[in-house]
Amino acid sequence: MALLFDSACIAIGEQTLYQGFTWQDLELPQWCDDIYFTGNVRRAIAHQSPSLVHRLIELIDHHAVHFALVPAEAPLCLLLPEIKERQSVAEVLKAVQQKLPTSTEHERTLFCYPYGSASFLVALKRIAQLANSPYGCWVVALDSSEVFCSGIEHQSFEETKTDSLLLARTVDTGTGLAFSPVQIDLHSQAYASGSDSVMPSLASLCKQELTDLCLPLKGEESEQWQNHLPRFSPWITQQTRYHFNQLNSGELGTGGGLLNALVLYEQQKQAPNAHFHALQLDCDPLGMAAGVLYRWRSEE
């Protein structure tokens, strides 16, 4: 199995990037200093929202034209920030369904993954199964920041906070990304971070040099994965490339995992490397961590 990744749109703040995007196309974030927060932001909606769930629904309305790109018959996986209340998940899911094209002859297959930054990798096995459909599997990642919600104390931050929606199509083809079993774990009393379990598991699966590493930069999480890099000796070399995509995009949250896969796919498609072997780790502080190894499979 090898997955083709086709980015339909990447909406970050007020800007939407389409196929063939580069980071040079992304406009600089806006500096904001008001009664709510101080920092760089990329907002699609200028006002503060009552809650994160309410803001997600507002973003769905804002991006209605992009949801219309999904064929009525295509299966879809919806990736969301960590939302523990079932009713809140149901409200977001209903808002998405109202924007999607419908068919009287076909009921859409739709799965929801409200697991934050790890959502894409948690969903990856299901995405691969659905990618066999005639329309492929479509993936929507939607997220925002709680600093865009009223009722919080004023705070300052260094990371760029974003409203974001990523929409991509995946197809099971003879050429594309092939992936190892996804490793998943939660923060617990036994582990300071889910990464403390996921990284050793990935190290045990790694049997060849790593050409690329896609890793998060989130405070203590960075320290956690750094502590485990020696486990990958001798597979990490001076030629290994490190990808910290959020430095360009800002905090995408749920969309970060999908973006990592899109970046790796586009890189390999444009500049093929016969030895391509990549590691992707997505995690949230005190939340879920997920990791995977990719190879490039070609039918040629």
Regions found by a protein language model. Give the residues of each.
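Conserved "HGTGT" condensation-loop signature of ketosynthase/thiolase-family condensing enzymes
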Residues: M1-Y135, A141-S144, I152-E300
